[in-house]
């Protein structure tokens, strides 16, 4: 991932886009804080997190620096991150979908820009098309195209999805083309999502038991890594420098190289965990809306733990987790500022964890 920052003096970044329409509850998190009410005309930037509540929706008009003309729709119940890697002729924009659904209609302005949409299991490449990308709380993914075509990949499966077609990936199964034509995209999306929820309800206690096992393990691993990260003197100093707008000097100075080497150890440990954990706890929060208040919440998912008790515990953990994840994302940005706008490798690269590029 690359960010447009100077090492000697912070510079204003170009926006990823501008809010063109908003309704309901929509929040933007930037530099470790949630901004005020989201309004028409607000700019959004690379590394922002955009979250829509169950009544929320936001449409973002893409900035010309992305190399794309068009808009991005973030539907209700969604959490996404915006990523951007600048290049004179082939800038790359990435929408990292944590939960929820997005849609977009884009075309290239000039050169060879790309727009990529991804979650933990599926990557979709776009150059000029109209598409939808939907995740269910169960972890299933639906990708469909209504104009042009999109390339979609997962593990060793690569598919080309033409207009009027879709593909899905269910946890534990391979990405596959759906054997149906899509005439009304929104109706198809809603039916697919409802089918996923009904399948979950049919086996909710067992599914929630698996969520609980994974949540508890990842929660413990996260805080084991987070405590030394949070107490880092280097992180505190970087945050103070950011608040004061201090000049940062050479990215290759011995002192800064030592700082970066220590911080990337913390960042790498947390990233390994959050790549899955952030999605898990946000999906559990979505499932709570489905289960709480129904008879399922009284069923045990393991001896002594009911579905309702587990879901309420996760919801009570969520505010602190949200703050701590935001601090981690802020640290990523502070690192990149001090590393010529780059993390050790682009965050979408498969070889990140093996990199020694500081």
Predicted region positions:
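Flexible, surface-exposed loop/linker segments and immediately adjacent secondary-structure boundaries
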Residues: 7-57, 61-249, 253-256, 287, ...
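Long, low-complexity or tandemly repetitive, helically biased scaffold regions used
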Residues: 216, 220-358
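Hydrophobic h-region of N-terminal signal peptides that target proteins for export
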Residues: 1-6
């Amino acid at each position: 991932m690359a960010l447009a920052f100077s090492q000697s003096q912070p510079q204003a970044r170009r926006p990823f886009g501008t809010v063109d329409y908003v309704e309901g509850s929509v929040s933007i998190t930037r530099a470790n804080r949630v901004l005020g009410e989201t309004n028409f005309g607000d700019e959004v930037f690379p590394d922002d997190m955009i979250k829509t509540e169950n009544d929320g929706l936001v449409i973002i008009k893409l900035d010309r620096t992305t190399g794309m003309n068009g808009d991005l729709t973030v539907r209700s119940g969604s959490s996404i991150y915006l990523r951007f890697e600048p290049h004179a002729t082939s800038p790359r924009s990435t929408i990292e979908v944590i939960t929820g659904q997005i849609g977009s209609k884009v075309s290239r302005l000039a050169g060879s820009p790309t727009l990529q949409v991804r979650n933990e299991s599926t990557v979709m490449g776009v150059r000029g098309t109209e598409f939808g990308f939907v995740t269910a709380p169960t972890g299933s993914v639906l990708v469909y195209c209504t104009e042009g075509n999109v390339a979609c990949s997962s593990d060793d499966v690569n598919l080309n999805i033409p207009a009027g077609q879709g593909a899905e990936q269910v946890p534990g199964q391979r990405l596959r083309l759906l054997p149906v034509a899509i005439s009304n995209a929104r109706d198809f999306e809603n039916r697919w999502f409802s089918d996923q929820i009904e399948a979950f309800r049919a086996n909710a206690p067992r599914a929630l038991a698996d969520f609980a096992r994974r949540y508890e393990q990842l929660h413990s691993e996260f805080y084991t890594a987070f405590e030394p990260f949070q107490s880092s003197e280097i992180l505190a100093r970087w945050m103070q420098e950011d608040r004061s707008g201090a000049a940062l000097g050479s990215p290759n100075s011995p002192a800064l190289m030592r700082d970066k080497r220590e911080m990337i150890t913390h960042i790498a440990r947390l990233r390994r965990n959050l790549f899955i954990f952030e999605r898990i706890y946000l999906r559990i929060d979505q499932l709570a809306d489905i289960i709480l208040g129904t008879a399922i919440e009284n069923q045990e998912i393991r001896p002594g733990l009911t579905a309702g008790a587990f879901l309420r515990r996760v919801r009570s953990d969520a505010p602190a987790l949200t703050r701590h994840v935001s601090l981690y994302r802020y640290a990523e940005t502070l690192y990149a500022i001090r590393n010529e706008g780059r993390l050790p490798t682009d965050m979408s690269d498969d070889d990140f964890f093996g990199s020694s590029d500081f």
